[in-house]
Amino acid sequence: MIEVLLVTICLAAFPYQGSSIILESGNVNDYEVIYPRKVTALPKGAVQPKYEDAMQYELKVNGEPVVLHLEKNKGLFSKDYSETHYSPDGRKITTNPPVEDHCYYHGRIENDADSTASISACNGLKGHFKLQGETYLIEPLKLSDSEAHAVFKFENVEKEDEAPKMCGVTQNWESYEPIKKASQSNLTPEHQRYIELFLVVDHGMFMKYNGNSDKIRRRIHQMVNIMKEAYRYLYIDIALTGVEIWSNKDMINVQPAAPQTLDSFGEWRKTDLLNRKSHDNAQLLTSTDFNGPTIGLAYVGSMCDPKRSTAVIEDHSETDLLVAVTMAHELGHNLGIRHDTGSCSCGGYSCIMAPVISHDIAKYFSDCSYIQCWDFIMKDNPQCILNKQLRTDTVSTPVSGNELLEAGEECDCGTPGNPCCDAATCKLRPGAQCAEGLCCDQCRFMKEGTVCRRARGDDMDDYCNGISAGCPRNPFHA
């Protein structure tokens, strides 16, 4: 049985609370100071693991108490996860570091069906959570008091650059056949696909972080943690299978022209990387400022292709959440997803596949993305993402009724009387599409257009999309 850790977080009035401060996420104009106080439920004398499998945090946000449920992201790494760097004389050094007891979590806010969370507990609490449609960031304060943390809204992070940032993909979408939405409406977890992702860090990014490989590694792991959460909506699971840091020099010519860099990276992956490391998709993270407003570029509909199942990403922000969204966006192109248009809707202020980054952080894929992704998968049937290769040594026994989906679960079992979820297997019963959620009724997704959350004040209602159990936030909210 997983022991649950209860941490009570008390907000404290701080002399400089509300003033500007420089954090790892950037310059923040308004923030609250909190002090996490750990209260463990483990029996006296019990051996406490470094990072618990499941945790809860009680905290106050804007004066209101909330409970944050977190669960260790057990499928974050593949079974053969490796890390490679280069010695000063150019020798390739590859290791398989232990990642069983890692410190990356995902979760939700209690009593908020539209909430999400991605948190790193490696050195204090760092990450983000969504509460009542607002995105909050949390990270440790570098003070003599090591327990102090800052919590702040994403909107209070100063914009690093007012210039527009956008994806470099400019393909003519009208050349594609119309998508038949009806054919995609009955997807269940049995259709799930699995992507083993390999990330490469160029020499410029290595130098940007002063050669601190540990800092780069933590940043990458948290960004994949965020990506993994975003792709759950598409029934796609992501596992990080390897990281390579070009610590000595670049292995290709990384240049401001993104198309040329993407072409070179694809060739290198095909002729070098794939010969020594099995994986499904590779991304290059670079400190190079691509020409124009471009911050990322990928081939479209190319998943599993030796050269073209690739993307290049500019490390364009101090906020790992923003770079993670760019990584998720470019991977979406590899899966055949196009840029969103005005007719597409999603649960966030901005959709992940929007061609231009919005000042409102993108959190979800749109209904269009869902349909286009599975249209590509069903038509092209990319074989490399059929196999599930997650770490079996990190999977603990599922805990029924903990309101979190754990490794191997399709639904949270609860009690044997659940008509949608088999309590013995934690799998959906035959014919069931869902077991819980504001848009789940009698084990089926509610019809598109059904009101799932009434508006407050002058705001707008939220509606079910007909293809998921969650209640997506209306993109036209005030």
Swiss-Prot record:
The active site is at E330. Gene3D superfamilies: Disintegrin domain. Residues 1-20 form the signal peptide. Optimum pH is 7.4 (strongest interaction with alpha-5/beta-1 (ITGAV/ITGB1)). It is found in: Secreted. The disintegrin belongs to the medium disintegrin subfamily. This is Zinc metalloproteinase/disintegrin. It comes from Bothrops jararaca (Jararaca).
